[in-house]
C-alpha cells in the first residue's frame, strides 16, 4: 500500500538571505539579521576532516566529498518527493528515482524506518528563525513525527 501524506496548510514568513564576508544571514520580518545555523556550525573545529584530507590527498577527498554530496542530494529529493505523494500521484516521474541504485537503497532504509512515522506535514523547505537563540536556517520538513510536531532534517 502506498503512503498518502496529509499536508496541513500553514503560513510562514519568507526569509530573505544576505551574504556578508562569505557568511549567510537570514533577515526576519522584523529586519533582524540572524546567522544561518550552517554558518554557526562551520566555526567548529574540523580537525577530523582536515586530517582525513591530508591522509588521502585533495584529489581523493574532493572526489569522495563530491560523490557523497551528489548522493545525499538525490536521497533528499527522494524523501521530499515521497512526502509530496509523488509515488501515488506521479508514478512515471517517481520511477525515475529507481534508476539511481545507491541513493534508492538509502532512501528505502529511510522510508521503512523513518518516513513512515511522519504525518500531518505543515511545511517543507522553509526558513525558520529563533529570536531566543538568534539563529536561522532552512528546514527540510515540519510535521508530526510519531504524533509529535517536529522539525525534521534529512541527513
Residue ranges and their predicted role:
Residues 1-136:
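Metal-dependent nuclease catalytic cores that hydrolyze phosphodiester bonds in DNA/RNA
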Residues 76, 137-155:
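Conserved catalytic cores of phosphodiester-cleaving nucleases, focusing on short active-site segments
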Amino acid at each position: 500500500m502506498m503512503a498518502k501524506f496529509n499536508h496541513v496548510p500553514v503560513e510562514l514568513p519568507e526569509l530573505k538571505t544576505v551574504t556578508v564576508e562569505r557568511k549567510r544571514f537570514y533577515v526576519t520580518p522584523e529586519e533582524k539579521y540572524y546567522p544561518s545555523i550552517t554558518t554557526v556550525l562551520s566555526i567548529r573545529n574540523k580537525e577530523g576532516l582536515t586530517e582525513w584530507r591530508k591522509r588521502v590527498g585533495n584529489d581523493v577527498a574532493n572526489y569522495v566529498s563530491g560523490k557523497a554530496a551528489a548522493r545525499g542530494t538525490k536521497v533528499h529529493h527522494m524523501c521530499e518527493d515521497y512526502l509530496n505523494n509523488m509515488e501515488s500521484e506521479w508514478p512515471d516521474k517517481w520511477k525515475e528515482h529507481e534508476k539511481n541504485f545507491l541513493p534508492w537503497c538509502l532512501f528505502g532504509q529511510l522510508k521503512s524506518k523513518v518516513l513512515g512515522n511522519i504525518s500531518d506535514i505543515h511545511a517543507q523547505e522553509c526558513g525558520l528563525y529563533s529570536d531566543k537563540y538568534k539563529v536561522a536556517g532552512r528546514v527540510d520538513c515540519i510535521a508530526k513525527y510519531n504524533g509529535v510536531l517536529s522539525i525534521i532534517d534529512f541527513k
